[in-house]
Amino acid sequence: MSTIVDMVDVSLVDKCCWICKESCDVVRNYCKCRGDNKIVHKECLEEWINTDTVKNKSCAICETPYNVKQQYKKLTKWRCYRRDCHDSLLVNLPLCLIVGGISTYTLVSVEIIKLMESEETSELTKVFLVTSFLGPFIVTVLSALRTCIDCRTYFLTTRKRNTIHTLQELEDDDDDDDDDDDDDDEEYADAVEEIIIGPSN
């Protein structure tokens, strides 16, 4: 425990970013950590919280939510990820075009119209012709609907992946009570110990 206390009360003479391990001359208030765990470059921390693997935008030690501002990249600078594209989008779009073309051709076919208007055409033949048109038409409508849903999902997923979180400092809270400082220090030391040493059995 003495090691943890020394780490919490570490001097800021040799300031070093805890992410890149490079020199850091300015200590900003991004969370409620103290000591060397508070020393970090803004660029390093922003790059860290913008990675896909980081889902929780809060400090891993003190669990303080970062003050981040969400922005979207310009549409011309979006990066599209192939894994975000749903497989059905690649299947439904060509299917919609192919079946739609067949349905359109069937609808405007002169020969079919003539057969439908002919008195010699049996009722069974007319039913078959109507069914042969309605079948592809229904498939076309369903495929188009599914394609629209997949396109919307792909757009929202791509937009989320092209989101930039800009980091800002926390606002000073002058209303905190000094009576809870001892408890906060103890919880903070336990959190640092668990991250560095590992959870106790």
Curated annotation (Swiss-Prot):
Record's keyword annotation contains Zinc: yes
Primary location recorded for the protein, binned into one broad class: host cell
ZnF start-end (RING-CH-type): 9-69
Positions of region (Disordered): 168-188
Lumenal topological segments: 114-123
GO cellular component, one term: membrane
Mode of membrane association: Multi-pass membrane protein
Compositionally biased spans, kind Acidic residues: 169-188
Catalytic activity: S-ubiquitinyl-[E2 ubiquitin-conjugating enzyme]-L-cysteine + [acceptor protein]-L-lysine = [E2 ubiquitin-conjugating enzyme]-L-cysteine + N(6)-ubiquitinyl-[acceptor protein]-L-lysine
Domain comment as written in the entry: The RING-CH-type zinc finger domain is required for E3 ligase activity.
Name the record gives this protein: E3 ubiquitin-protein ligase LAP
Protein species of origin: Rabbit fibroma virus (strain Kasza) (RFV)
